[in-house]
């Protein structure tokens, strides 16, 4: 399990983390807010954090060469329109990828499903193979 302090979340959002875990079946990214969500404008804060986390998640997907099934557990949003916007924003970030990647949908549990074409092993697998040689 890899905890990554997200960059680019702004001074207001200093305690957000992305937890990234790779298994044989899929990669899972969990967006964790820490204690940064206040009581005022909570939905606006959640939306902003999720949009920034989507940008960093797309970056990490490319850097770590994650592929196959990728699930992202964003912070739950009440608005279906906000979920649709998040899905579209993520697809826009994925469109800049050299490998075909598709933000498929957001499940009833609020988890975004992504597929990304597998061409090489993810970076963690490449490193572990090199160590074993």
Predicted regions and their residues:
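Conserved glycine-centered short motifs in functionally critical loops
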Residues: 15-133
């Amino acid at each position: 399990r890899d905890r990554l302090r997200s960059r680019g979340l702004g001074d207001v959002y200093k305690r957000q983390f992305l937890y990234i875990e790779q298994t044989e079946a899929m990669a899972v990214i969990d967006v964790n807010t820490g204690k940064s969500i206040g009581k005022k404008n909570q939905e606006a804060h959640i939306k902003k954090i999720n949009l920034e986390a989507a940008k960093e998640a797309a970056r990490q997907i490319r850097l770590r060469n994650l592929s196959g099934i990728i699930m992202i557990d964003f912070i739950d949003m009440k608005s279906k329109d906000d979920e649709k916007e998040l899905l579209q924003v993520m697809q826009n970030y994925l469109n800049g990828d050299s490998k075909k990647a598709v933000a498929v949908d957001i499940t009833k549990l609020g988890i975004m499903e992504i597929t990304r074409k597998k061409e090489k092993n993810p970076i963690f697998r490449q490193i572990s193979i090199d160590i074993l040689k």
